[in-house]
């Protein structure tokens, strides 16, 4: 009985592993069909409207991009952004 449960769990795990690359391929295809969405500039502001905040000057000039395939060069991932039902990486420098 334990062997049957173990084999069932392994089969389910194998199906899940095979299903994940298919979902990723579908998302990449949708992204490739819409060029120009990968590098969307986003202006990020920290602080209150009066500008009296305790932030560093480097944070005020933060430039971020929504990227589908990962951050480039000096950028680092600071979260996610979405367009429709697709999630992208929020890469800032």
Curated annotation (Swiss-Prot):
GO terms for biological process: antibacterial humoral response. Its main location: secreted. It is found in: Secreted. Keywords: Antibiotic, Antimicrobial, Defensin, Disulfide bond, Secreted, Signal. PANTHER family: ALPHA-DEFENSIN 1, ALPHA-DEFENSIN 1-RELATED. One of its GO terms (cellular component) is extracellular space. This is Alpha-defensin 24. It comes from Mus musculus (Mouse). Coiled coil: none annotated. Belongs to the alpha-defensin family. Residues 1-19 form the signal peptide.
């Amino acid at each position: 009985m334990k062997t049957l449960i173990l084999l069932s769990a392994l089969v389910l795990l194998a199906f899940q592993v095979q299903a994940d690359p298919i979902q990723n391929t579908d998302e990449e295809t949708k992204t490739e069909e819409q060029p120009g969405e990968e590098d969307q500039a986003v202006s990020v502001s920290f602080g209150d409207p009066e500008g009296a905040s305790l932030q560093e000057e480097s944070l005020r000039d933060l430039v971020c991009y929504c990227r589908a395939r990962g951050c480039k060069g000096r950028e680092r991932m600071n979260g996610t952004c979405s367009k429709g039902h697709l999630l992208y990486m929020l890469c800032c420098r």
